[in-house]
Amino acid sequence: MAKFEIKEEFYLDGKPFKILSGAIQYFRLHPDQWRDTLYNLKALGFNTVETYIPWALHEPQEGQFQAEGMLDFEAYFKLVEEMGLYLIVRPTPYICAEFDFGGLPAWLLR
């Protein structure tokens, strides 16, 4: 496993490392588009992809989890690794203004 350190700059396995990241949200693309989209990101010189985990989509009803098709983040993460990219996962419960209620599921209000 690679060793990542933060000193005066980032280091990966003892060498200075710059994170060049672009955001590609797996849940906004059909899985058939993931590979080409990630390929294009890498072709532009990026080495990292960033994505949210939208709780409201993965658990729309309390206790009912969804992780198939466009929501199959495990398959997306494996593809990112297969393509030689690094991944920044943002499993935050709040996704700014991009989703109603910040991406939190509405059932939390009950």
Predicted segments, located by residue:
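N-terminal carbohydrate-binding accessory modules
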Residues: 1-48, 78, 84-86
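Aromatic-lined substrate-binding rim segments of carbohydrate-active enzymes
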Residues: 34-109
